[in-house]
Amino acid sequence: METKVKNIAIGTLQDYLVDEGIIFLKLLNDEEVRASFEYEIDKNHIQFHFCIKGSSEFNFNNGNYSFPVISENSILLYNPVQELPINASLEPNSLVLSVLISIKKFHSLFSDQADQISFLNQDNAGNKFYKDKKLGPMISVVLNQMAQQSVHESMHNLYLRAKVFELMSLY
């Protein structure tokens, strides 16, 4: 598993290549001032952003669109037409976990249920899709486990992969 930790002037961004086509991000601002984070990702990925603590804002298209995500809420973003690189601002003492999954990988996980997933059904195929959602208790438990990650380094990749799959099945 490839892990990168990037200390920005304020805040920390950790990214983990969990599996082919799946990236897990942990954005943490434990400072007393607002922190900004950027992460390049192509348009072939679905973005799930979960605000665990505090509040955040995701800006796209040179700041023309912004999506606030407050504690215990999430946003799903998919735009097959335009690149959506991540440009996030986190308020002080905030934590956001993100799962970036390629559309190909997502389809392979849910091919039998594709018609039940609103943005994968035939009517929406190829269209952009944005959805905000309050986190339920089961999803919150999984996200808190992912944030804590108290497993041995040799098992870390397997643990994150299992948690991402669990998270996707609950979402």
Where are these regions (language model features)?
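N-terminal regulatory/effector-sensing and dimerization cores
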Residues: 3-117
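Amphipathic alpha-helical segments enriched in hydrophobic/aromatic residues interleaved with Lys/Arg
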Residues: 118-163
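Hydrophobic recognition helices of helix-based DNA-binding modules
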Residues: 167-171
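Residue-level detector of solvent-exposed, low-hydrophobicity positions
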Residues: 74, 85, 127, 165-166
